[in-house]
């Protein structure tokens, strides 16, 4: 859908109906569309005003200073319909280490990256950043225990942000219309219509 900029399928309207229903029932805070990092996380999650936050595994790290004792839990977004992707499908790839192609010490840099992402240093990096470890056999932070089950069950991987950030126009269209949907400015139908423009 994103790759081809084709939002004409029935799943767009179905998606809109789900979020329109949540907005009508009051499940979404009124200022959700204008929540900008880090204010929304600190004001709403860390203070306990919101019970749930649509985000990623990096959130516990981002607000650990404001909510060090938070009891974290994660779940995979369920399939919207039997024909769509379900909890087996997730996106990966938010951070990485890189070596400049012009580096005179590329081999040393690579060995350092290996050193930092294996064994005790991988576990320490994961523990202190409350992040996903690199190695499959490293211990995960307790805050991400549920996320580990999700990642371990993933059989289909999407590109980062499902590819929406590859196109500024598509990115803007999704962000603008989704923001309007979750605060009730768009109905499911007007959301679906706007996504085809």
Regions found by a protein language model. Name each.
Residues 31-46:
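Short helix-initiation/N-cap motifs at beta->coil->alpha
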Residues 42-44, 60-66:
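Pocket-flanking alpha-helical
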Residues 46-55, 70:
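Alpha-to-beta junction loops
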